[in-house]
Amino acid sequence: MKTAIIYWSSTGNTEAMAQAVAQGVESVGAEAVLLTPDQVDPAALGAYGAIAFGCPAMGSEVLEEMEFQPMFDGCKNNLCGKRVGLFGSYGWGDGQWMRDWENDCGNAGISLVAPGVICCDAPDDAALEACRALGKALAE
């Protein structure tokens, strides 16, 4: 199964998480394609059996608003029936942005394969393993 891993990262933390998700996808023999928001065509998402979205918490615990949020909003209608996962890092707060993002997905009829994977600042070994597990769950 071909899996898209779409992420936005300013410090490299969420990018490291995206790479770990890709490792998980590839560990079960599936194809992982890493994309940034500017590379995403919502109409082309049909080519993927599963999609992971990664975005850090920004500002007052919201998704990045200039590139990522508009791209994600444009993709929502193409995600019903897909295997979807979420991940991201944060530097303060308690992960509220991920709970809000999960609720947004639920309200849009998007079912997630697992709870969103989050970590504070740079991902440690446990966070990277959780990302690999998310990749496996998406691809299996």
Regions found by a protein language model. Name each.
Residues K2-T3, N13-A16, A20-E140:
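FMN-binding flavodoxin-like domain, especially the glycine-rich phosphate-binding loop
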